[in-house]
Amino acid sequence: MLALDLDGTLAIDNHQVLPATRDALKHLHDADVEVVIATGRRYRSTRYVIDNLGFEVFAVCNGGALVKMPDTSTLHESSFSSRQINELAAIARDMGIPLMAQRDAHDRGGADFVIDDQSPWRHSFHQYFDAN
């Protein structure tokens, strides 16, 4: 097994994989080495990199909260309940902090991000949202 981070390790310019890197990983994949992408990114943006590889891999996304199989099915998902989300949103509102959460919308439809924008966004939120 070979586990790789995306940003600054496997992917350059956001989604691109260098041809030499792609060829080396394909060689390992063909030799039955499991290639795993491990990232803090959401699955949808990780898919762009997987598509550039040319073969399917395991993907550990959202800092380990979501694990996808090579066939894109979900192996593991750690989610907050609706009650927990409502409690977190109430706390964030009381503190004047905007709340942004990610969900696995792949094959489910809908948005990847759930945003409670009752509070103004800070610059760091804009940066994160634009990058992901």
Question: Where do the protein language model's features map onto the residues?
Answer:
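Asp-based phosphoryl-transfer active-site loop
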Residues: M1-N14
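Anionic-ligand binding region
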Residues: A131-N132
